[in-house]
Amino acid sequence: MDEEKEADSPQPPSKLPRLSGADPNAGVVTMAAPPPPVGLGLGLGLGGDSRGERDVEASAAAAHKATALTFMQQQELEHQVLIYRYFAAGAPVPVHLVLPIWKSVASSSFGPHRFPSLAVMGLGNLCFDYRSSMEPDPGRCRRTDGKKWRCSRDVVPGHKYCERHVHRGRGRSRKPVEASAAATPANNGGGGGIVFSPTSVLLAHGTARAT
């Protein structure tokens, strides 16, 4: 009978853990150990290696320095780098690259009312403008007819025109001015302050003949 009861009673599965009375920690619930942190390499100190963190910090510092410049400062930096490239290549620096720096230094050093002229600094013969820097024939006379024709002669040093066109129009504009200026002192100084007009002379001559 006892054997039949034991056979009829359900047997516990063999895979279930069984508590042993000899175990001193029996029945004690313990927390599982946390898994090691995953290194993301974001420089946040969460499991990343020190070398990766240093690289990220260095790149972040470089990006911060790059963004610390304003737009105008960035443009000026690129301008100076371009000038340095001309120096490194041994080529002459174009005038339109030097002119902004010259204006900036001169205005900050001498003030707006004491701006030194280019002739005083020995640069009077240079044409500091973008049009002259882009001139295809800088040594050619600039006299044109307003269309396609242009004088083919060389310019006079320090001028924009050749010997033929450098004095063009000066004599004609000065002749009537010089003639009137020379006639005025002669009329004022000959009669002791009395000026005789041609009309008065003719009237006096006609009156004398009538008498």
UniProtKB/Swiss-Prot annotation:
Cellular component annotations (GO), alphabetically ordered: nucleus
Pfam families for the chain: QLQ (PF08880), WRC (PF08879)
Transmembrane intervals: none
Motif window: Bipartite nuclear localization signal: 140-150, 168-175
Major location (coarse): nucleus
SMART domains in UniProt: QLQ
Domain of life: Eukaryota
Domain QLQ: 68-103
Protein location: Nucleus
GO BP term, example: regulation of DNA-templated transcription
Molecular function terms from GO: ATP binding
Domain WRC: 135-179
Region (Disordered): 1-32, 167-190
Keyword terms, alphabetized: Activator, Nucleus, Transcription, Transcription regulation
Function in brief: Transcription activator that plays a regulatory role in gibberellin-induced stem elongation.
Family of the protein in this entry: Belongs to the GRF family.
Domain notes: The QLQ domain and WRC domain may be involved in protein-protein interaction and DNA-binding, respectively.
Name of this chain's protein: Growth-regulating factor 10
Organism from which the protein derives: Oryza sativa subsp. japonica (Rice)
Taxon lineage: Eukaryota, Viridiplantae, Streptophyta, Embryophyta, Tracheophyta
